[in-house]
Amino acid sequence: MKIVHLCLSCFYIDNYRYQENELVREHVAAGHEVLVVASTETYLDNLSLGYTSPGRYAGSDGAEVIRLPYSGPFPFFLKKKLRMHPGVADILNSFAPDVIVFHGLCGWELLTAARYRRTHPHVRLYVDSHEDANNSATGFLSRLLHRFYYRPIIRRSLPWMDKVLCISLETMDFCKALYGIAPDMLEFFPLGGYIADDETYQKYRRELRHELGFDEAHTVFLQSGKFDAKKKLTVSIKAFSKIKSKDFAFLIVGRVHESIEAEVKRLSSDEPRVRFLGWKSADELYQLLCAADVYVQPGSQSATMQMSLCARCPVVVADVPSHQPFVQGNGWKVASLEDQVSAFEQIERNPALLQAMSIRSLGIATELLDYRRMAKRLLV
């Protein structure tokens, strides 16, 4: 089949494991002809969003990538919100896809995709949505955009969509409330991940723990991300420091924003059990998660939580509605420093409970998060 992924309302970043990357990678691996059409938005330094040059090249996920500039007679700050791009209709007509996957519900080119679907009724059009009340329509200008620009575009395009794929329960609520999308048009389609087989998992776990100097008596916690105050890394370190077990270790993977860097250094300077491993590629992070015993994410949401379930980690994560499907007997939902300390104390008292939680995390990942299964879903 011929599949086009339109990443014009979101970023597409080479060498990452975001949902867009994983679905493209799975479609390529399955032998389909895949094209990615993306904006120029990307990460410039693995920390800050920026913009690259338009062009055409072979992407890291195995598909050809066409990057299009923003268009329109507007200042750049507005163009990147309106999300108009030149030549999208011509690309669709030339490539002649069987399936269109439009990533990100909010953008002008959704109309272009819907027009193509209308004139080619055999084509499937799936639109994914990451929007929710925490990240969209939160400020005055953003509310205006969503109400008077994005919503009319979405409403005009709805008759030609096959499904709106929502990454969370909060996203489903948001799409119903703000855009007026009927419940039967919405489908739960969470951020997923790669699930290693037993042999590969044990290999990663054994090799990485040996490399890091851990034996099976150690309980290894891991928190990762682009750390700002919302990630609550400082809360994690404070909670961890209250547990004195010498068999506990805390790994920090990623980059710390300068706004919290001094506090993080102060909190961890006298804590030898805390290690900074720096920035890691997606594959390296997955292997580290296989080596870890518990994934920690008490702050803002990240796709690494789903990756950690695929790596069989029990979790300590923020108590928010979007985590409800993913924390079912395999970890703790926390809303405060005290909650996090309590979770760590329970693990200290009975580390054996992590074994059953690990099995449960694998079960949840297999049921909900396997990108191989999710990629196949987009073909029907």
Description of each model-found segment:
Residues A262-E284:
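Nucleotide-activated donor-binding/catalytic signature segment of Leloir-type glycosyltransferases, i.e.
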Residues L288-S300, C313-P314:
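Acidic donor-binding loop of glycosyltransferase active sites
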Residues G193-Y194, S224, A249-A262:
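Glycosyltransferase donor-sugar binding loop
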Residues M1-S53, D61, S241, R372:
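N-terminal subdomain of nucleotide-sugar transferases
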Residues A38, R124, R143, R151-K203:
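Donor nucleotide-sugar binding/catalytic pocket of nucleotide-sugar-dependent glycosyltransferases
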Residues V4, D215-K231, I237-F240, L251:
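Conserved donor-binding/catalytic core segment of Leloir-type glycosyltransferases
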Residues P351-V380:
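A charged, aromatic-enriched C-terminal amphipathic alpha-helix characteristic of glycosyltransferases
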